[in-house]
């Protein structure tokens, strides 16, 4: 039956080759895993699986049931990064979107030892690794750019580099990668060595199928495909997104859902929508210097609200904030 379906697909001339190849690849992977694609499942089995998940969570005796981010308050609100979730992270330029997800990747890959794939469409893999050097070794990022390091900093750099080199981190910096190519690579990673987390920097730089009538529709198609990928591989997918300039016209410049650029169906597809905001970027006299707000504007299966993190610009690093510096939520 599968061979007949594949043969029929090959004779279609009204569909992009990449879409046909994607369906064929997915069918073969399902066959290798001895399962059907989209089969009905008796409710009894679903109930048993759900009860097993709850029992497993109870045995952990903690609030984090997913993959920890390393940020205590954020993990408490989200219970970690949950399998099959599409997590959208958005902010205006210079708020630290890339730095934030690299902090998460650092914790997940280096300290949780979980395989993490980063698709970097804006920065080269060498630039990302330099940022990771600064994060892990705590050496000033500017010193890494100039090479003006003291002896103890060289030692810390080497120690950090060894940790990074031995980690299960994968970086792909293909410019303008298409969703079909990304999906194919992720399936291969998952099949060959396992895959626990996917990070995309950033959504609007991805290429679509070319079938969409507008860029907004194309971005919506990409976000829908990313949600499908998260479900298929049962891993969290973090996608970075731009915000439109509307936020700059308001007195309160904290982002809102309506600020998502090329939004279309992005906010509907995402299980979690988060924004980054730093008051000291706009208000130089604020008493909240180097404090970032992580605003959870949407969480399909959990609470919304704001957590605060310390911002260490010399390392492009976020950190947990001491309780004495936190602002109580309304």
Predicted regions and their residues:
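Amphipathic alpha-helical transducer elements in NTP-driven molecular machines
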Residues: 18, 68-71, 125-129, 151-161, ...
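Structural recognition of the conserved hydrophobic beta-strand(s) that form the central parallel beta-sheet
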Residues: 199, 236-241
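C-terminal regions of RecA-like/P-loop NTPase motor modules
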Residues: 180-195, 224-234, 245-330
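Cytosolic-facing regulatory segments adjacent to core modules
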Residues: 76, 107, 111-194, 208, ...
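P-loop NTPase nucleotide-binding module
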Residues: 79-124, 177-190, 196-199, 210, ...
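Short, small/acidic-rich helices and loops at N termini and domain boundaries
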Residues: 1-60, 84, 95, 114, ...
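Pre-Walker A adenine-sensing motif
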Residues: 71-80
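Walker B catalytic acidic pair
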Residues: 202
């Amino acid at each position: 039956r599968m061979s007949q379906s594949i043969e029929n697909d090959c004779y279609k001339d009204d569909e992009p080759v990449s879409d046909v190849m994607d369906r064929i690849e997915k069918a073969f992977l399902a066959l290798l895993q001895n399962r059907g694609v989209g089969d009905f499942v008796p409710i009894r089995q679903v109930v048993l699986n759900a009860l097993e998940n709850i029992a497993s969570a109870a045995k952990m005796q903690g609030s984090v049931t997913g993959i920890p981010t390393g940020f205590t308050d954020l993990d408490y609100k989200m219970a970690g990064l949950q399998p099959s979730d599409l997590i959208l992270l958005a902010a205006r330029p210079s708020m630290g979107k890339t730095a934030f997800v690299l902090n998460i990747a650092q914790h997940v890959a280096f300290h949780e030892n979980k395989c993490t794939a980063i698709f970097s469409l804006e920065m080269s893999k060498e630039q990302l690794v330099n940022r990771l050097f600064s994060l892990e070794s705590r050496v000033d990022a500017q010193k890494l750019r100039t090479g003006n390091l003291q002896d103890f900093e060289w030692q810390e750099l080497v120690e950090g580099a060894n940790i990074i080199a031995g980690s299960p981190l994968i970086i792909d910096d293909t410019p303008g990668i298409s969703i079909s190519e990304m999906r194919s690579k992720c399936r291969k990673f998952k099949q060959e060595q396992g895959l626990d987390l996917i990070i995309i920097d950033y959504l609007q730089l991805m290429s679509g199928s070319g079938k969409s009538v507008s860029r907004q529709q194309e971005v919506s198609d990409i976000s829908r495909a990313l949600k499908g990928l998260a479900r298929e591989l049962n891993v969290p997918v973090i996608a970075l997104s731009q915000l439109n300039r509307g936020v700059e016209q308001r007195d309160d410049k904290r982002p809102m859902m309506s600020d998502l650029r090329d939004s279309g169906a992005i906010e509907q597809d995402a299980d979690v929508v988060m924004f980054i905001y730093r008051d000291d970027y706009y208000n130089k006299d604020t008493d909240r210097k180097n404090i970032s707000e992580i605003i959870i504007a949407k969480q399909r299966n959990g609470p919304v609200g704001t957590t605060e993190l310390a911002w260490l610009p010399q390392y492009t690093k976020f950190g947990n904030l001491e309780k004495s510096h936190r602002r109580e939520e309304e």
